[in-house]
Amino acid sequence: MSVDVKSEFSENDSSSSSSSPTNVNNVAWPNYQMMPFMNAQPLRDKMLQPSFDPQLYGRWPQMGEAGFYGHSDIYSTFALPQLSTNGQILPTAEVVEVKPPLSNGSSSSDSGMYPSPNDLTPFPSTSSGIGASSSSSDLQAAAAAAANYQMRAATCYQQSVWPFMDYQQPFPWKMPLGSAGKERRASSDTKSLPTGPGTNNVRVRTADKYRMVYSDYQRLELEKEFHTSAFITSDRKSQLSTMLSLTERQIKIWFQNRRAKDRRDKQKIRL
């Protein structure tokens, strides 16, 4: 059995060797998708287009080598002003035409895509005297008006903004109390200061503080409330503040002083 099998293999080898040699590339491989490296598909066939067209992917025309767009009709001519020795602008009739260099890919047919400068309404000039038709008197008047405007603007700025930003002068409330400070303070004390609510138009000065003087009606209402309760609640305090035109702090201090006075009176009675 083993001999017969060997003979069969030998016959197959001899038949394969006797056949004519074939080219590997010409063989139609059934598993071409599994072995793409044998005969790779060109990358050009996979692209949507054989070459990159910038006009297809860009909305606007591409810039040329010199950095300008390839349409000369969108550039208009302008005049360059000249300066005299004293710095004034003189009228000039020389018109300098600036046109960008055309790129290799630009053509005359592209000019229809853009309107010509003659069809467009020019913007009004913001300065007088730049065009070629301006006279020297107009230029001088414009220069004088500009200089006058700058001087007025600088003066207005100094008068309005600079006094508030002058930090070199010290603030009056930061200065030490010297002789000048004492005189200024004495002069301010002599002024008639408005009295607060419920002061009965009287202010009694004790050292550097002012003591509140209650009116008869305010003292009567506070005394009645104290005999009702020696400790006032916050709700009642707000009600008395509205009724007597006093602050809650003034009412609180009055009750504290009234309780202290009541304790002293009780101690005197015990003694």
UniProtKB/Swiss-Prot annotation:
Q: Which terms does the record give in the GO molecular function aspect? A: DNA binding; DNA-binding transcription factor activity, RNA polymerase II-specific
Q: Where does it sit, as one GO cellular component term?
A: nucleus
An example Pfam family from this entry, by short name, is Homeodomain
The answer to whether the entry has keyword Nucleus is: yes
Compositionally biased intervals (Polar residues): 189-202
Q: Which cysteines are joined by disulfide bonds?
A: none
Which segments show compositional bias classed as Low complexity? 100-117, 125-135
Q: Where is this region: Disordered?
A: 1-25, 100-135, 178-202
* Localization annotation: Nucleus; Chromosome, Centromere, Kinetochore; Chromosome
Record CDD domains: homeodomain
Which residues form the DNA-binding region? 207-266
Give the coiled coil ranges. none
The UniProt keywords, alphabetically, are: Activator, Centromere, Chromosome, Developmental protein, DNA-binding, Homeobox, Kinetochore, Nucleus, Transcription, Transcription regulation
* Function description: Transcriptional activator. Interacts with promoter regions for tbx-8.9, tbx-9, elt-1, hnd-1, scrt-1, and vab-7 genes. Binds the sequence ATTTATGAC. Binds to the enhancer region of the hlh-1 gene promoter during embryonic body wall muscle development. Activates the gene for mab-5 in embryo development. Necessary for vab-7 expression in C blastomeres in the posterior of embryos. Required for posterior V6 neuroectoblast cell fate specification during postembryonic neurogenesis (patterning) which generates the characteristic ray lineage during male tail development.
Q: How does it assemble?
A: Interacts with tir-1 and let-756.
Recorded family membership: Belongs to the Caudal homeobox family.
Q: What is this protein called?
A: Homeobox protein pal-1
Q: What is the organism field in this record?
A: Caenorhabditis briggsae
